[in-house]
Amino acid sequence: MTTVDEVVRATIARRGPIPIEEVVELALYHPQAGFYASGGRAGRAGDFLTSPEVGPLFGAVIARSLDTWWREAGEPQTFVVVEAGAGPGTLARAVLAAEPACARALRYVLVERSAAQRALHAEHLALEDASEAFASMPDVDGDHEGSSAGMPPGPIVVSLADLPRLPGPSVVLANELLDNLPFGLAEQTETGWAEVRLALDGGSLVEVLVPAQAFPEVAVAVGARVPVAAAVNVWVREAIELAGPGGRVVAIDYAASSADLAARPWTDWVRTYRRHERGDAPFELLGTQDITCEVALDQIVPGPTVSTQADWLRRHGIEDLVAEGRRIWHERAAIGDLAAVRARSRIVEAEALLDPAGLGAFQVLEWPGS
C-alpha cells in the first residue's frame, strides 16, 4: 500500500515545496494511509488519552450540561447535539449511559471523517438512518411542539462523515478536535514573515521558507514560529452557523495566544503521539503518529467565553457526581459490586479531569450560534 511519506514525496516532486497544512492533512486523513485510516485512535489501547477515555465521568458531566441547556431552551421536543470529531464514539456512549433528562428529545449526531473510526460507532451504539431520524424535524421558524408530532422518542443516534445541515438550534460539541485540524507554520525572519513548507533535498524531506501569502498580526522575535490556524477558523465559523440562533458551540482543547506560542519552542505546541509516547519530529513517520497543534486563540472567531476545563466541569456539577460516588462507595464497598467499583472510579477520574497540570488546564471555548 502507498504510504503517506510516498504521497508527500510524489507531490513535492510534481509541484515543489508543499505547505505544512497539506502535509498534516495527508498524514492524519489520507483515506488509505493516514493515521486514522490505518488504526490510529484515542484510548488506553490506542495512541493517546482524551478526557472521555479517562472514564464515564466526563460524559456524565456533559450530560448534565446538555440538560441545563435543554431546560434553558424551554425543554423542546427535539434537542439536537452534534459531536464533531467523535472518534470511536466514547463520549457519546458515556453521555447516553448517564441517562440525561433530555434523552427523549435528544437527537445525537456523531460526526467523524475517518471511515475506520466511524465504523466503530455501530459496535456500541444503536444507530438510525439520518434521513429517517430527522425527516420530521421542525423548520427553523417552526413550532417545536406542533412540528415534532409523530417523531419517535429519543435518544436517536446518527453517525455522519461531515457536519450536517439541520434546521433549528443545535449544540455543537468538539472535544480535542481543533488541535487535530490541519495547520500551517509561519516563521519570523529578518525581512518579515515566511511560510514553512516541506521540500526534498537529496532524497530527504526538509523544511524550507517561502514568502508568506498571509501572516499572523503579532510581533515576535526573529526565528520564532507560530501556527497558522486558517482551517480551525473556517471550522469554527461553520459550527457557529450550524448551531444557529439559540444554539451554542463548545470546543475543548489546548489553546493560547499566538504571542504566547511564539515565545515557546514550536515543537512544544506541535505534538505527536504514537502508542502513548510523545515524539519530537512531527514530519517524520508520516501517517503513523498523531499530529496536534495548540489553537491560536487570536486567529479564530473572536468573542468566545473561555474557561479552564477544571472550572467548566465544576460549574456543570462534577463535584456533585463525585460526592454521589463517594456516598455509593461507602455504602457498597463491603459488597464490592459493580456499582461500588464505578462509584470509586469517579473519584480517580475526577482527579485526572481536574488536574491543573494536565486535562484540567485545557481551555473550554464557547460561542453562541448565529
Q: Residue ranges of each PLM-predicted region?
A:
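Short, glycine/acidic-enriched loop or turn micro-motifs at the edges of active sites
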Residues: 86, 115, 178, 256, ...
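Conserved protein kinase catalytic core
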Residues: 118, 181-182, 259
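A mobile, often basic/glycine-rich helix-loop segment
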Residues: 170-220, 263-273
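A residue-level signal for conserved active-site and pocket-lining positions in enzyme catalytic cores
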Residues: 27, 172, 300
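Long, Lys/Arg- and hydrophobic-enriched amphipathic alpha-helices
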Residues: 214-370
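Generic recognition of stable, solvent-exposed alpha-helical segments in well-folded globular domains
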Residues: 3, 18-22, 53, 57, ...
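Rossmann-like AdoMet
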Residues: 1-84, 88-162, 166, 317-320, ...
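A short SAM/SAH-binding and catalytic strip from SAM-dependent methyltransferases
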Residues: 158-190, 226-230, 234, 238-243, ...
